[in-house]
Regions:
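C-terminal structured interaction module
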Residues: 200-264
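Short, functionally important structural connectors and interaction interfaces within domains
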Residues: 33, 59, 145-147, 199, ...
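Hydrophobic packing positions characteristic
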Residues: 81-209
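Alpha-helical interaction segments
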Residues: 34, 38, 113, 151, ...
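N-terminal, charged low-complexity regulatory/assembly segments
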Residues: 1-132
Length: 264
């Protein structure tokens, strides 16, 4: 057997849920006085899958805490069968878990669980995102008056955006605080959660619907500051003050970068 063929067989064996090796692989290995080749392979197989389960539990502690060991491991093993590790780093092992849940469970069960998984993954993405230089209040104070109307901004790389239709934040907080998990409940109104990294600390904040629409307008749809004020015209003379208040909050949070008008 060529080395490449042997390596492929070992990989297929480790990725399989069945701990019994095929005869060709087993016969290629030597037993010792204390351990047979089949026993050695089984130990390696179990250790590998245990490490994958450990990684998924670490990435999704709230999902794990909500389901418990047995149900989480059953879900995780089904996920690993459908999505074997394809990356050299365990960092990306759980990237598709939320989408998998949507197709694996019936919709009534999948919706709150996949939303919680997306929330946890958003925290992971925020922490690992590339650095960005946030626009500061000091820089804004120095901005010439004529530049305010054309001001455009974008989100920093670490900022993640999630619309929650269930009490996923309450479940996540219960896990963080090691408290009792509340029952999963649909929200009366959807909740927009923004997650970002502040130096080495991951932070989050829930936004009211009007603030979420304003932030999305400026950072996704490309509104200028003048256009934001225009969207708030129903507030009358209070529109500029509301726009400035939101902008100050976003800058204090450290969410934004300025888009240079000179860039193409």
């Amino acid at each position: 057997m060529r080395l490449s063929e042997w390596q492929a067989q070992v990989q297929a064996y480790l990725l399989s849920r069945d701990a019994r090796p095929n005869p060709a692989l087993q016969s290629s290995l030597l037993s010792s006085a204390a351990l047979s080749a089949e026993q050695g392979l089984a130990i390696y197989h179990n250790a590998y899958r245990a490490r994958l389960l450990e990684a998924l539990r670490g990435d999704y502690p709230a999902v794990h805490g909500w389901l418990g060991d047995e149900e989480f491991d059953a879900l995780a093993l089904a996920y690993l069968d459908a999505h074997p590790s394809q990356h050299f780093s365990l960092r990306w092992l759980g990237a598709q878990l939320a989408d998998f849940i949507d197709g694996y469970l019936v919709p009534a069960q999948a919706a709150p669980l996949s939303e919680l998984a997306r929330l946890e993954w958003a925290f992971t993405l925020a922490f690992d995102a590339p650095d960005g230089l946030p626009l500061s209040l000091t820089q804004m104070a120095e901005l010439p008056a004529e530049d305010w109307p054309i001001l455009q901004v974008r989100l920093l790389p670490s900022v993640q955006w999630l619309v929650c239709r269930h009490n996923s934040l309450a479940l996540w907080r219960a896990c963080k605080e090691q408290g009792d998990f509340p029952g999963s409940q649909p929200l009366e109104e959807v909740e927009t959660c923004v997650i970002w990294r502040d130096q080495l600390i991951t932070r989050y904040r829930s936004l009211a619907a009007d603030e979420a629409a304003a932030l999305q307008g400026m950072t996704v749809h490309g509104w200028s500051f003048a256009e934001l004020c225009g969207e708030l015209a129903h507030l009358g003379e209070q529109a500029p003050a509301q726009a400035v208040g939101w902008l100050r909050q976003w800058l204090t949070d450290g969410l934004l970068q300025r888009i240079d008008s000179a860039q193409p």
